[in-house]
């Protein structure tokens, strides 16, 4: 169900955004989303620009699921593979009964496929699954793509990149400072260069406000990058 949030819309408008891509952020195969114009003075009939903006996926099980499976990343990948195989079987007319979920998946196969990942390795895993089934995902990254830029480039995927940078560590207390790993320090230092590294390596990307606690920090972080 879609409900227009006037307050959030005004925040995005003030940050320079006129359109948003939205969907139900729950589950592995999440269905299609909506492309919405941020017009607080119009009705939804005019705001909704596209009722099938893309198909959305992730490796995260639905919060509403009552099943224990999948309980691991490997299990989520296996379930996604099996669903694709079932959808292909269903499309060939091999099932006696109609499966509405598989029908919907097949109907959405020509849409842009946007895969949300939580880290660099998940981005590579998602691309691997897509390659098995001839699907080129657009990947929602995590901002650490610079760590394995050669592997990221080899995916040939378009990326949607957040710019939610880590805060500087408080090292005023020497006991706490000792607990900060060198890896974390390096990541804090280098992650603002992620966009530069992607650009220099010819990786196509767009930016997202996703994961920002406040949309107001978008331009500040962009200037930092």
What are these regions (language model features)?
Residues 23, 116-118, 140-142, 160-164, ...:
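Generic beta-strand/beta-sheet core signal
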Residues 5-138:
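Polyanionic/metal-chelating signatures
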Residues 1, 112, 158-225:
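His/Asp/Glu-enriched, well-ordered alpha-helical/loop segment
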Residues 130-136, 153-160, 202-204:
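Glycine-enriched alpha-helix->loop->beta-strand junction motifs that scaffold or abut catalytic
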Residues 120-122, 143-147:
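Short acidic loop-to-helix transition motifs that present clustered carboxylates
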Residues 31, 148-151, 168-175:
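Short, charged, surface-exposed secondary-structure boundary motifs
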Residues 85, 95, 103, 124, ...:
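Extracytoplasmic and endomembrane cell-envelope/extracellular-matrix remodeling and assembly machinery
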